[in-house]
Amino acid sequence: MRKRIWVGLPLALVFGGIFAFHTVFHIPEQPEMTTISDGSFNQQLHCYESSTRASIDQEGRLNLLVWNIYKQNRANWQSVLTQMSAGAQLILLQEASLEDGLKRWIASGGWSGEQVNAFKAFDKAAGVLTLGWRKPRLACGYTQLEPWIRLPKSGLYSEYPLSDGQMLIVVNLHAVNFTWGVQEYQQQVNDLIAALKEHPGPAIVAGDFNTWSEKRLQAVTERLENAGLIEVVFSPDQRTRFITGLPLDHVFYKGLEVQKAEAPQTDASDHNPLLVSFTLPTDK
């Protein structure tokens, strides 16, 4: 009898853990996207298209905020987000939890956007969120499963019209983290930047790349450089760094001109935000 109890106990713990995981987390079978427009939040599947012609830049200027917002777990996230996004036309958030406080903030600012539902925890969606003062022409969500913890990371591909007639590609990425090698990491990056090599116009690829090792940093840098993108240099550079000293968050671009780039410090998240001011090229 005692042997049966000891054999059954580990099995009970395993099945109990599986049950608890599926009770807390809901993982979509395919990427799901929530579209945001005029204060309304609507569920879409994978891709969204619009007929908008409104340009995302403002008279040739494009101010960008990139920030892993840590699921809004810090009490001062809202005031800092308001401060950091002042004057921005484009916001790329990672680990955004689409709860009531963030929904109200988005609606009050008149933002349009899309969130990729990587997973839901206690029925609240979390994933990358791209917000713009104008709607995108196209937006598609992507997910890549973390091989160890079995929770996906998400990415969002968007296309925005520009005032000079070109189309801007924007990729908002939260890269997989818990991998032994770089295979899953490379696959996620490859899926999202596949269209960049064929795109002759401007592009921005930004987010939390989880580049905590030299192999990861090299993998993403080589692929983006091969697609013609350049990494933004920040000053001051207070980007969040791993114990290896490597920064986790990056902005890459092509077909635009950088006027200012800074990564200030804040305690409103476990990541510091990235602020970049672009202009459209004058010698197109």
Curated annotation (Swiss-Prot):
GO terms of molecular function: catalytic activity
Key word Phosphoprotein present: no
Coiled coil start-end: none
Signal peptide boundaries: none
Domain of life: Bacteria
Subcellular location: Cytoplasm
GO CC terms: cytoplasm
Pfam families: Exo_endo_phos
Gene3D superfamilies listed in its UniProt record: Endonuclease/exonuclease/phosphatase
Alphabetic keyword roster: Cytoplasm
Family: Belongs to the UPF0294 family.
Name of the protein this chain belongs to: UPF0294 protein VV2535
Originating species: Vibrio vulnificus (strain YJ016)
Lineage of source species: Bacteria, Pseudomonadati, Pseudomonadota, Gammaproteobacteria, Vibrionales
